[in-house]
């Protein structure tokens, strides 16, 4: 045995070191005894024996007294060193470079204490920090209990991090290991068995809310949360799901069964004032939730007044070039009140009603048209369900402003030139495409010479003929020259706009009522009796918008542009007037605020007729005296533009109205400045900054529209 000792005037130190021989080296054992020794001297002695570099904080002062009767190896000797310092309020903090720092224990919390884990938990009185996750217990609730078991006055501390539900514990390794064992024992899954309680009379949502409110009251009265059951309502099956500790679960189930009892009062009556929906319409929807009965005396279909399914605007006796707009909306106040239902509600104050059966319970729903309200008599649970349905249906429906541009251009060029000859003895050359046959002219002239009157056929031919006709009638010879060059244009321009509710059909109609002869008969007194019907011609626009997801609008369109054919048209006959009709029936999907071309037509018709006398008509120069030529070229262009704008609130509606008024007012002022008080349709505008002009539409088809041979 090798002995080593240090003696001071204020104390003594004895230390014995044993070196055990082995083939590879020596193993050291230590025995220590200190009495009244300066603590810094004690630290220096241990540092020298363990061959460690130790930094001593200046605040480390005092004397120690300790004695060891057993022999210790290096590990035990180091733990003995840590325990002595812990008793006197000091701690050792190891550094990354192997240096040890001796500081006061209360200052060690902010030092770089090693992070321990299950593989390296630390030994004895070493300072360590552990991060312990919790799975079943709230770290916030467990942390205060663990602080009481740790050395909070010294280097120990316990904090929790609620977002991750973890504990952060710092202290002596042995103490922290004991705290971790306690946490693992407490953090276990409790009894979470679930029980489903079906309800017969009560509402699952109401029962679950009531039981949870009682649990919150118990929690405030310091009842542990583990002793409370979790209660969740299943509205689909009208049942309540209960989970938790067995005793808490049994208490909750018993409470639920006590609440699920048949009510003495089977029903109540409530008046619900609607804000936007129509009471008569909602009756049909609510009646679809149950089995309809025939107990009520009045049927909703019989007493329901005929309500228009769409908003409409019309104008008659107007010119083709026009623009107009119309809108419709509805609103009403909202409130509800409970009241008794007696004979005060007779057939004069309510219109329409149904008695239906929902979940085996009788429900009566009536509509009061004057106040746009519903009178419902139903059990409380059914009443709540109906109120939820009504609140979801009684909403402000968005509106759609539909703006259209209808541009139609017609151009017709015609040429009619011919010469007809006649001889009373030799015959005649007659061409029917000239408008006046020479035979009619000769017979009419003979009668006029004899008695001074015209034949009916001659008078009719002259009244319907346009152009120049000239000739001579001398002796047996007569000649008739007819000439007509026509150039007609017809422009139909309109910018109708209409506002309608979502999924509501709207109609715009601007036109004239044109009389059409449908029959004629002669009475016994030789009076002619005519039967006349009137046909509407003009511009008709019928649209039904449907707002879809993503602010897209599905437009169902029915558009018609009709007019009376020109009197010079070849399609006109003595049977009556001819109508030009263009119809578009379509459905398109348009994004809110975008313009779409719904339909278009580019049409060209050419008719040419050449009549001549054989051989004579082919003679150069002189052949023109024996020919008749008729030529007609018609071109027609029709385009229809639509632009929907969704209006969801009154502010957007007001803005759209102001923009329309300003556009109209500016055009009116401009026309008045030019000396014309009536707006022309050379410029067609859509709101939102998009402008389309008649000339732009015309120029886009200019290649097709160029006149030929002119």
Swiss-Prot record:
Keywords noted in UniProt: Cell outer membrane, Membrane, Protein transport, Signal, Transmembrane, Transmembrane beta strand, Transport
Compartment annotation: Cell outer membrane
Tagged with keyword Transport: yes
Position of the signal peptide: 1-27
Domain of life: Bacteria
Region (N0), start-end ranges: 28-105
The keyword Protein transport belongs to this UniProt entry's keyword annotation: yes
May serve as a pivot that allows opening of the central gate for substrate egress (site feature) positions: 511
Region Secretin: start-end pairs: 401-648
Region (N1): 123-190
Record region (S domain): 691-710
Location of region: N2: 192-262
Region: N3, residue numbers: 288-399
A Pfam family annotated for this UniProt entry: type_II_gspD_N0
GO biological process: protein processing; protein secretion by the type II secretion system
Region of interest (Disordered), residue spans: 289-353
GO CC list: cell outer membrane; type II protein secretion system complex
Domain description: The N0, N1, N2 and N3 domains are periplasmic, while the secretin and S domains form a channel that is partially inserted in the outer membrane. The N1, N2 and N3 domains each form a periplasmic ring. The secretin domain forms a double beta-barrel structure; the outer barrel has a diameter of about 110 Angstroms while the inner barrel forms the central gate with a small pore in the closed state. The S domain interacts with pilotin OutS.
Function as written in the Swiss-Prot or TrEMBL entry: Involved in a type II secretion system (T2SS, formerly general secretion pathway, GSP) for the export of proteins. Required for the translocation of the multiple pectic enzymes. This subunit forms the outer membrane channel.
NCBIfam families: type_II_gspD
Record family assignment: Belongs to the bacterial secretin family. GSP D subfamily.
Subunit structure: Forms a cylindrical channel with 15 subunits. Interacts with pilotin OutS.
Protein name: Secretin OutD
